[in-house]
């Protein structure tokens, strides 16, 4: 089982972000009491699930957010101790934490996070150019990234991921590759490289809608993506999903669990869980979430995952990965033969350079991954036509 811990707090909201988060910092009233209430409810939620699920091994824990590194290391230590007590942390479990560079500028804090049990850091770098960091509303600068990485390596962190963004307003391929080179000089074990998505209602989207900034043209963004793949590969980082690259042995086990359909338990406001054929999402409202926990009903909005939804999800998530979709799984989930249903469609994708068919697996090429949403939507329409 995987466990995801959603930490809903941020010092401020970045200009591109539409995720659920709550302000936390010196200017926020009652910060300490809000964190204490959140911690108590989260541990209570763990207790409730332990009573329902019984003891089972946990292969991965991911502290996401929000900004988990805003909370003191004793929070992560307490959560991991409770997970191990109730469920059992498997030997060699991957324990990841998202962190902002400015949260890791004190060596003592870095030491404490690793001592608490964190063995993988996913750092929200986004850009190595201070001009773009300011445009994105990020609270750190390039110098903070360098210092944070220095502290992490000195403290013994041997599994470091850097999160980067491409397709930024005013960016071209040369600038993106320069950013990548700068980040790769830090020798990360993992890189996540995401194309910027303008979320409705965010400050960045409003600026774009008002004509105050422009995004790179589609063909320029395609070059950024494909040239980025080549540069990352030249530095020993293999692409294993649309936006994720790693050195051998450093694929994110947590994310691979999501993409391969593993059960996962999400804890905290706005966290989603999928367990034993059911799915639910906790309310994003912290007060309501705490009331749900106090009432002993953390999954009150659970719904069953139908066979069609299960099939769609396995197709969609598998085709995000470079390993692709195993055709035998289609038979298991639908009772039908994939190539009998979709063989001609597959051959068209292969001929267009968008996919490869290797024995019993269908996988998208880098060019196919660029248009994966359209490919998957087309496949879902075919399922409708078949009455599945």
Predicted regions and their residues:
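A short, conserved structural fragment
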Residues: 351-360
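Short amphipathic alpha-helical interaction segments
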Residues: 336-350
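Minor-groove-contacting beta-hairpin "wing" of winged helix-turn-helix DNA-binding domains
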Residues: 361-365
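C-terminal scaffold of the Radical SAM
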Residues: 1-2, 21-52, 56-336, 386-388
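Short active-site neighborhood of thiol/selenol oxidoreductases, capturing the structured segment around
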Residues: 4-6
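Local cysteine-cluster metal-coordination motifs and their immediate loop/turn environment
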Residues: 8-21
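Short, amphipathic alpha-helical interaction segments positioned at domain boundaries
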Residues: 369-388
